[in-house]
Amino acid sequence: MLKVKIVRLNKQAFLPVYATRHAAGMDVSACLEAPVVVAPGSAELIATGLAIELPEGYEAQLRPRSGLALRNLISLPNSPATIDADYRGEVKVILVNHGRDPFKVSHGDRIAQMVVARVEQVSFVEVDTLGDTERGEGGFGHTGMGQG
């Protein structure tokens, strides 16, 4: 298992945890002095009280929690949010409220999932043409919505 260094910037911060044995993402919790209300149609930056040191060649992705999305229409507008290996500041989560009701975030609430993944930097090679494929330039729904 990959070891990632983590610092509690606030002693009240909760470490990310896997909710189940085979979970891909760890639950990330809010670290707040007072509740934050995310008004309908708005976004708020939520502190976690944590900083991480990822190994070179890795990123951490912050993703919405499915239960918050389904029940409250709460999501992350930049999902997946990327935390680069060279970032050393506090991990914060942008929550957006797509619902009609205000959403209150309290200290300790699980607000996002974190997935740590290997990444590779690439270099582009400029060419005059690209190879042909069956799909070609088809995109954005070109295969339709019909049954499988």
Swiss-Prot record:
It comes from the Bacteria. Its cofactor is Mg(2+). It catalyses: dUTP + H2O = dUMP + diphosphate + H(+). GO terms for molecular function: dUTP diphosphatase activity; magnesium ion binding. One of its GO terms (biological process) is dUMP biosynthetic process. Substrate binds at residues 65-67, 78, 82-84, 92. The keyword Hydrolase applies. Pathway: Pyrimidine metabolism; dUMP biosynthesis; dUMP from dCTP (dUTP route): step 2/2. Its EC number is 3.6.1.23. It is an enzyme of class 3 (hydrolase). Keywords: Hydrolase, Magnesium, Metal-binding, Nucleotide metabolism. PANTHER family: DEOXYURIDINE 5'-TRIPHOSPHATE NUCLEOTIDOHYDROLASE (PTHR11241:SF0). This enzyme is involved in nucleotide metabolism: it produces dUMP, the immediate precursor of thymidine nucleotides and it decreases the intracellular concentration of dUTP so that uracil cannot be incorporated into DNA. Belongs to the dUTPase family. This is Deoxyuridine 5'-triphosphate nucleotidohydrolase. It comes from Chlorobium luteolum (strain DSM 273 / BCRC 81028 / 2530) (Pelodictyon luteolum). The lineage of its organism: Bacteria, Pseudomonadati, Chlorobiota, Chlorobiia, Chlorobiales. The gene is dut.
